[in-house]
């Protein structure tokens, strides 16, 4: 069963959308762009904040574009050759302008991690912002952000934006689409750097108004992911965790989309003893279920981000990414005694087509040891401390409605 990895960005308009004097066209839809008619021109692209000249040239006609595509407060100057005063002098100003932020589609965790930076961007610049993303995520977020226009990449509403920014994961040491490699700052925080806003993380806003429909205390788990490196590859880990949760009095609900997932000869299955709540449900239904869970246990994947946004504690198990690669949770489970952190290694490039990607130890007995060495005992120890923290509050509601994720150990 192959998951869809459909993902694409909105391309810039074929010609710049802004009209300057003497038929000069310009915009900021792929960095700074200038299209010049026949003439003798001198063009400068500057960083307006530092005053540094980033590029200058003499040109008779054609295009001048910046190499940097992320947010820079560009200043475009176009002179007639030999003249001291610019004919066009435009400094990027997004206030009351049509701006597009293009996100990839099909990546729940990425979008939930990135989107708060788009809201921060709109609030800072007071622009007319449109964001493109997958429809199921639009359905989840749009009611909470009325000041932002949402659309799918196939049907953008803004056809002539003043500026466009493309938030995504850029590999291979790319510093034209991102000012700092996402693997050095955490993939979600890279959106803050691309958009030029405060990179501190924040959860998305969600509709948390649904009532609790399950009387017993319960914990939600999600065990599936998009590649084997993201799984918890300890053979008995999940079985030990489910048994421990039941001994503490919790129902254990598995809320993955698929009960079984894999490729080729490697398949992963719903843990024995967990209740099967799997299926392709609207994201809001998952929110309704998570909101009243005592806590959530999962991987470095989208449902962990969704659980975090509902405000419940998240036990996050990961080894292929470093502890600061995702949102902060005091209940992070990481084992430093083996190979780890390949996702965040800037000398490596993740291979999306290799389901068994393990760049340092593939086809050896050390393959996936980053999570294989995370034992059920280690995870159950974190669960026991979290459970004790909930019990210590002396509020029975904490067991059924959860508690804020920022509580310490």
Swiss-Prot record:
Protein keywords: Cytoplasm, Glycosyltransferase, Iron, Metal-binding, Plasmid, Transferase
Phenotype upon loss of function: Severely reduces bacterial colonization of the gastrointestinal tract of orally infected C57BL/6 mice.
InterPro entries: Aah/TibC-like (IPR030929), Glyco_trans_9 (IPR002201), TibC/BAHTCr-like_N (IPR049327)
Reactions listed under catalytic activity: ADP-D-glycero-beta-D-manno-heptose + L-seryl-[protein] = O-(D-glycero-alpha-D-manno-heptosyl)-L-seryl-[protein] + ADP + H(+); ADP-L-glycero-beta-D-manno-heptose + L-seryl-[protein] = O-(L-glycero-alpha-D-manno-heptosyl)-L-seryl-[protein] + ADP + H(+)
GO molecular function, one term: glycosyltransferase activity
Gene Ontology cellular-component terms listed: cytoplasm
Active site, per annotation: 110 (proton acceptor)
Compartment(s) of residence: Cytoplasm
Binding site for ADP-D-glycero-beta-D-manno-heptose: 107-109, 224, 226, 230, 257, 302, 326
Cofactor annotation: Fe(3+)
SUPFAM superfamilies reported for this sequence: UDP-Glycosyltransferase/glycogen phosphorylase
Co-factor binding details: Binds 1 Fe(3+) cation per subunit.
Role played: Glycosylates autotransporter CARC. By glycosylating CARC, involved in the colonization of the mouse host gastrointestinal tract.
Protein name: Autotransproter heptosyltransferase BAHTCr
């Amino acid at each position: 069963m192959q998951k869809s990895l459909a993902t694409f960005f909105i391309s810039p308009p074929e010609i710049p959308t802004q009209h300057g004097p003497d038929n000069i066209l310009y915009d900021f839809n792929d960095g700074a762009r200038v299209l010049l008619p026949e003439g003798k021109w001198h063009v400068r692209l500057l960083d307006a904040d530092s005053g540094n000249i980033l590029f200058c040239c003499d040109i008779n006609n054609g295009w001048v574009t910046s190499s940097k595509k992320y947010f820079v407060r560009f200043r475009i100057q176009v002179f007639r050759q030999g003249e001291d005063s610019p004919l066009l002098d435009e400094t990027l100003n997004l206030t009351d302008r049509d701006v597009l932020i293009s996100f990839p589609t099909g990546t729940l965790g990425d979008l939930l991690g990135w989107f708060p930076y788009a809201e921060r961007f709109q609030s800072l610049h007071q622009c007319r912002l449109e964001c493109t993303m997958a429809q199921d995520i639009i359905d989840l977020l749009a009611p909470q952000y009325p000041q932002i226009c949402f659309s799918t990449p196939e049907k953008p509403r803004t056809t002539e934006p003043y500026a466009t920014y493309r938030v995504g994961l850029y590999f291979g040491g790319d510093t034209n689409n991102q000012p700092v490699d996402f693997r050095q700052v955490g993939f979600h925080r890279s959106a803050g750097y691309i958009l030029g806003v405060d990179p501190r993380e924040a959860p998305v806003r969600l509709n948390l108004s649904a009532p609790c429909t399950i009387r017993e205390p319960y914990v939600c788990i999600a065990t599936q992911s998009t590649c084997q490196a993201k799984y918890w590859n300890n053979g008995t880990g999940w079985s030990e965790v489910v048994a421990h949760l039941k001994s503490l009095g919790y129902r254990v609900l598995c809320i993955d989309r698929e009960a079984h997932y894999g490729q080729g000869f490697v398949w992963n299955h719903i843990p024995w003893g967990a209740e099967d709540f799997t299926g392709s449900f609207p994201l809001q239904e998952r929110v309704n279920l998570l909101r009243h869970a005592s806590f959530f246990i999962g991987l470095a994947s989208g449902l962990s981000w969704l659980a975090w946004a509902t405000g419940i504690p998240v036990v996050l198990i990961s080894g292929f990414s470093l502890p600061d690669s995702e949102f902060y949770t005091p209940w992070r489970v990481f084992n430093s005694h083996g190979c780890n952190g390949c996702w965040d290694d800037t000398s490596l490039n993740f291979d999306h087509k290799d389901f068994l990607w393990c760049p340092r130890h593939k086809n050896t007995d050390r393959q996936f040891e980053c999570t294989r060495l995370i034992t059920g005992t280690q995870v159950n120890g974190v669960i026991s401390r979290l459970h004790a923290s909930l019990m210590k509050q002396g509020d029975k509601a904490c067991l059924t409605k959860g508690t804020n994720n920022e509580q310490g150990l």
